[in-house]
From Swiss-Prot:
<dbReference type="GO" id="GO:0034715">
    <property type="term" value="C:pICln-Sm protein complex"/>
</dbReference>
<feature type="compositionally biased region" description="Basic residues">
    <location>
        <begin position="99"/>
        <end position="126"/>
    </location>
</feature>
<dbReference type="GO" id="GO:0005687">
    <property type="term" value="C:U4 snRNP"/>
</dbReference>
<keyword id="KW-0963">Cytoplasm</keyword>
<comment type="similarity">
    <text>Belongs to the snRNP core protein family.</text>
</comment>
<dbReference type="GO" id="GO:0043186">
    <property type="term" value="C:P granule"/>
</dbReference>
<dbReference type="GO" id="GO:0000387">
    <property type="term" value="P:spliceosomal snRNP assembly"/>
</dbReference>
<dbReference type="GO" id="GO:0034719">
    <property type="term" value="C:SMN-Sm protein complex"/>
</dbReference>
<keyword id="KW-0539">Nucleus</keyword>
<keyword id="KW-0687">Ribonucleoprotein</keyword>
<dbReference type="InterPro" id="IPR034102">
    <property type="entry name" value="Sm_D1"/>
</dbReference>
<dbReference type="GO" id="GO:0005686">
    <property type="term" value="C:U2 snRNP"/>
</dbReference>
<dbReference type="Pfam" id="PF01423">
    <property type="entry name" value="LSM"/>
</dbReference>
<dbReference type="GO" id="GO:0005682">
    <property type="term" value="C:U5 snRNP"/>
</dbReference>
<keyword id="KW-0747">Spliceosome</keyword>
<feature type="region of interest" description="Disordered">
    <location>
        <begin position="86"/>
        <end position="126"/>
    </location>
</feature>
<dbReference type="GO" id="GO:0097526">
    <property type="term" value="C:spliceosomal tri-snRNP complex"/>
</dbReference>
């Protein structure tokens, strides 16, 4: 299971988050999106070497998060169960498994609409 999918299941849990700049944030998770952006409510934020600040809500950009410290009584075994069904491998499509290089339905570089002019070497000289 991906980390983000696990974090998405943590709604309504109270966590401590440490940011890359040293700020400590404590609050209740309202939601986490696929970019790990985390939305909290009832937040206490302590900027490094400053006094704590109380906030109603706070959104944290995912790439600023260093640690998420989970509460001890959290039932990890139930949260880590991957309940998303696996995607089945698609059947090989015609032309899809042609190996490396260019190539689609009509082949590599040729095909219709190849550009200006006719045959290589130009047309007749006048």
């Amino acid at each position: 299971m991906k980390l983000v999918r696990f974090l998405m299941k943590l709604s309504h849990e109270t966590v401590n988050i440490e940011l890359k700049n040293g700020t400590q944030v404590s609050g209740t998770i309202m939601g986490v999106d696929v970019a790990m952006n985390t939305h909290l409510r009832a937040v206490s934020m302590t900027v490094k070497n400053k006094e704590p600040v109380k906030l109603d809500t706070l959104s944290i950009r995912g790439n600023n998060i260093r640690y998420i410290i989970l509460p001890d009584p959290l039932a990890l075994d139930t949260l880590l169960i991957d309940d998303e069904p696996r995607k089945k491998a698609r059947a090989a499509r015609a032309g899809a498994s042609r190996g490396r290089g260019r190539g689609g339905m009509r082949g590599g570089r040729g095909g219709r609409g190849r550009g200006r002019g006719g045959p290589r070497g130009g047309g007749p000289r006048r």
